[in-house]
UniProtKB/Swiss-Prot annotation:
Keyword Transmembrane helix: no
Top-level EC class: transferase
InterPro entries listed in its UniProt record: Aldolase_TIM, DAHP1/KDSA, KDO8P_synthase
Family per similarity comment: Belongs to the KdsA family.
Organism encoding this protein: Xanthomonas euvesicatoria pv. vesicatoria (strain 85-10) (Xanthomonas campestris pv. vesicatoria)
Record's keyword terms, sorted: Cytoplasm, Lipopolysaccharide biosynthesis, Transferase
HAMAP family xrefs: KDO8P_synth
Catalyzed reactions per annotation: D-arabinose 5-phosphate + phosphoenolpyruvate + H2O = 3-deoxy-alpha-D-manno-2-octulosonate-8-phosphate + phosphate
Recorded metabolic or biological pathway in which this protein acts: Carbohydrate biosynthesis; 3-deoxy-D-manno-octulosonate biosynthesis; 3-deoxy-D-manno-octulosonate from D-ribulose 5-phosphate: step 2/3; Bacterial outer membrane biogenesis; lipopolysaccharide biosynthesis
Annotated transmembrane regions: none
Protein name in UniProt: 2-dehydro-3-deoxyphosphooctonate aldolase
Gene this protein is translated from: kdsA
Amino acid sequence: MKLCDFEVGLDQPLFLIAGPCVIESMQLQLDVAGRLKEITGKLGVNFIFKSSFDKANRTSGTSFRGPGLEEGLKVLDAVKKQIGVPVLTDVHEYTPMNEVAAVVDVLQTPAFLVRQTDFIKNVCAAGKPVNIKKGQFLAPWDMKPVVDKAKSTGNEQIMVCERGASFGYNNLVSDMRSLSVMRDTGCPVVFDATHSVQLPGGQGSSSGGQREFVPVLARAAVAVGISGLFAETHPDPSKALSDGPNAWPLDRMEELLETLMELDAVTKKHGFARFA
């Protein structure tokens, strides 16, 4: 599949979607995007910058949600033009899709909205590539009808993203079989290595996370075989305004990505034949 200006798929090298969870300031986004561009350029990795203008599903009603649509799009546009990288952001049911699509290169649907038929169709009808996150409550094989809805709009540039499955209260687990199952949708599969270690609502008024397991799950997913990796990152996760406990430190991204690219090359060298 053609994504932005590069090809993605199991016959192509791993690509990266990364950035801070939420837009905190113009300077932070430019700094992070610039550093990620340096890292990915050095390693030869195709890169899409990600950040959100509105986090609509925060645990607490008083938590920081972002700068909002107008200011958020200004920041994303600046990243795109000044840093020279494609940008992705997530949208919601109330989002003016065409307005966002005029700025960003890739749209993303939140996991909690994966079953909202009209929403999925509206996003995909905007004509941009779409990364559809699998709900924490959804079986991987149930992504096939979601993809069918998406492609009914005529948009063939659809990706599916695994971000963990609910496992009791305040916990997620990553079933690596889902990565293989979701290939049957015919779409590139992306693994979200940072939200997969989230502990939803685990700190009472906010979500916790176990960032030490980000490289563990990322390595496992790459070994199974994925098209892309999604990872939220921050220069100082302890001070991040959203999802800090599961964000990967920016100063450790190069080391992690270097390892993952080596694993990706070995995995894809041997193919993905099904064994009965």
